[in-house]
Amino acid sequence: MAARLLSSVSLTDVVLLLSSVWIAVHLVLAAYNVYLHPLRRYPGPKLAAASQLLNVYHVLKGDNCKWTAQLHEKYGTVVRIGPNELSYISPSANQTIFGGRPKEDKVFEKNPVAYLQGNGDISNIFFARFHDHNRLRKLMAPAFSETAVREQEATIQGYTNQLIAALRNRSGQAAYPDAKGVVNIIPWLHFILFDVLTRLSFGDPIGCLDRADYHPWVSVIFKAIIHSTYTQAAHRLAPYQWILKHFIPNDMTANYEAHLEFTRKQLDQRQQVKEEPVARADFSSFMLKGMSPDELFDNVNIVITAGGETTASTISSSLYYLVHNPSSYERLTKEIRDTFSAEGEITLAAVAALPYLKAVIQEAMRIHPPVPIGLFRVAPAAGAFIDGQWVPGNTWVSVANLAASRSPTYWRDPERFTPERWLGDAKYESDVREASAPFSIGTRNCIGLNLANANMRIILARLLWNFDFEAQPDNIDPHELDEYGIWETKPLNLKIKERVQTT
């Protein structure tokens, strides 16, 4: 009887039965997530509560951060953006999740789904868990201290000299008559920053400024970042991540692997001179003392990849908002040109004393944070209170950088570029400045913030001391760019005129 019954069942029947069971299971799971899950009382769209699909859709679309910001405008300072995930924008939540020096059992650890290990089980400082992070931070901190960065000023100034010379050449009508003095500034910011970072990491620059073009290794960095974003999105769909991974373009994967291979070769060469004295210490000089080769590889790779593009993004957005806000442009150029009578006076110590320059950079990072996404964490196993509400253990939590820094809850005229808000202007005294934390806070804040500030201040000050910049009709508002962990890159064409100095 049983044999006869089985013989009457076709393969199609089996597939239909299994499909029906699969659909039923996931419908039940979705219903549980919406109506019975411990996070059910938190506000947010029902579809986001039901499954990861809506979140992943916006990640792949390149507007996840803007989507999250829209949700916060609608639902408030905390939003449920996934079945087991909450997004916050309040400074108090930021302090709870990232601030202080909590004991190990109170730590909001990195979300292992969002921060995939780049090299097996080897940790880099960005992905590392509590104990590994403390160890790596101690090894790396001396390389990024204010003292260490001051010792690298000659390197930063030297490459800035090259940048200024190249732009001066291209601003002239005779050398490039077809361009009419219009230059896409984005590649040039990449050239100088990746030259600086590779010089400080490998001992030698990658030579972008020399060739006035992207080195192949740099050109694939942006694809490598998108590859990582797609991979992270795929892992949100576990156990079905293989489906999405199947659609990641092969050339993107190949570029990512080529990027890693070149990094390893450069570090292998640097390690061969480990015992030889160098003219000026670089990052590797510090990190070679206590890291394994694999740890060195992972950490140098993340420093270059994350540090170059984010710093370039802030300088370019500063220039964009300056040329589109004449009063701010005039005030900053006046501050720089009135302070310095000769370009050689523009030192790291001197630019640190320019209040409006610092305010411009702070405002650029507020209105266009270089890392717009929230930094993903997991609530302690025992749970925690965030903004007075109980969050169950192992809940995914984050603070949405873009949403927080543009929220009318914390800022007056949040869409307006106004550096004066950082200088005590009474009109903006209601602003909650802590809502903008582009370098994060606490013991896991950005280790490279001193170097980033040095690069941004020196490069921007010297550009505005040497040149006058004019906006072009095809300029794209940085807020309109897509984001894949960091912002995509699009041309920023500016007309550059060599400054006419008067005595």
Curated annotation (Swiss-Prot):
It comes from the Eukaryota. Pfam families: p450 (PF00067). It is found in: Membrane. Its cofactor is heme. Pathway: Secondary metabolite biosynthesis. Glycans are attached at residues 94, 169. Its EC number is 1.-.-.-. Belongs to the cytochrome P450 family. This is Cytochrome P450 monooxygenase lnbC.
